[in-house]
Amino acid sequence: LGAVSIAFIGMDHPEDMLLANNKYYTLAIVLIIYWLATFISLKGLSWVGKVAKIGGMVGTIIPAALLIILGIVYLATGGHSNMDFHSNFFPDFSKFDNLVLAASIFLFYAGMEMGGIHVKDVDNPSKNYPKAVFIGALITVVIFVLGTFALGIIIPEKDINLTQSLLVGFDNYFKYIHASWLSPIIAIALAFGVLAGVLTWVAGPSKGIFAVGKAGYLPPFFQKTNKIGVQKNILYIQGAAVTLLSLLFVVMPSVQSFYQILSQLTVILYLIMYMLMFSGAIALRYKMKKAGRPFRIGKGGNGLMWLIGGLGFCGSLLAFVLSFIPPSQISTGNNTVWFAVLFIGVIVVVAAPFIIYASKKASWVDPNTEFEPFHWEVKNDVSETNTTKA
């Protein structure tokens, strides 16, 4: 989206669309935005917080609200809808091809659980945090559903494009209200929003890896920081990995196909974690019956937990399986490349935590680490202490 937004800053939209479809241009912009986000992250969390806050408002919330309002105004003033709200309103889920794209819906909610790290900063978290999650999920549904309708209304079905439709939709609406001069402005805003989003993902996970490394799970090389305490080596390695992954642009047939395969890989990795979360929540009801739970699903018994956790697990499992199937709506090129990228990506990412956990060394532990031990490690320490005393 960042590359497309920058391409659409110009006023010659046919040329803008050609530029946005150029794989090498997109590769260059992706790397520029990512490394810019990396260098901003090296400035510390204060910089990250400021850019993310402003970018989230200017590049996400305001454009989303504007898009929905433009769609309402367009229909209210007699604009022609390119979207059929009758016979073809509901997709044909009997076709696997449609289910594959539907599986991407899980990505809309990805990261909702990340707010849990701030739960200690919330007043009365046992009540207010679940409320915040439900409200956030509702807002997400409203924005994505209404935003998608707004794009479907103004763009003919044959012209729908995974990477360009948002900018094309805004451009068409601005032409309708005779305000085409707003197109470059919204393109700049969206590009800034992309930078803010990338910045959040660059800084957040690397901070978590840094905390794990200081607990003795990574060599001292990964624990090195700059003058203000930012995990510089992890950020550089992370950037190098993204750079290598971006080279997929060269082997994929189009920008759309590259976007789709990365989206599918992201969905698959998220769903693996969600399946572990749902199954883990059920298992802990039996393995840690007496654990204190400020928030509990179901007042008594485990029936409601089985229902909610089971539905979540089954839905995630179905989407997980479907995500490996190439969609027919988008040319993904050689199926061998498609499956190879997905399977190798999953194997590497899933294997990494096990390798890191098995590699822990006492000599790697930073004395100032605040990393909490795993509960089974605490149990083992207690057992060893009791055995020694006996």
Residue positions per predicted region:
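Membrane-helix boundary/coupling elements in multi-pass transport proteins
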Residues: 109, 114-122, 180-220, 228, ...
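Helix-loop-helix junctions that connect adjacent transmembrane segments
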Residues: 8-25, 54-187
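Alpha-helical transmembrane segments and their membrane-interface junctions
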Residues: 241-253, 315-332
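C-terminal membrane-solvent junction of multi-pass transporters and transport-like membrane proteins
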Residues: 22-25, 37, 51-54, 224-228, ...
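Terminal cytosolic tails of multi-pass membrane transporters
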Residues: 278-307, 326-390
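TM-loop-TM module centered on a large, flexible mid-protein loop between adjacent transmembrane helices
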Residues: 2-11, 132-199, 218-266
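Hydrophobic, small-residue-rich membrane helices and short re-entrant helix-turn-helix hairpins
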Residues: 43-54, 112-147, 206-209, 213-228, ...
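Membrane-interface loop-to-helix entry segments
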Residues: 25-77, 110, 133-139, 263, ...
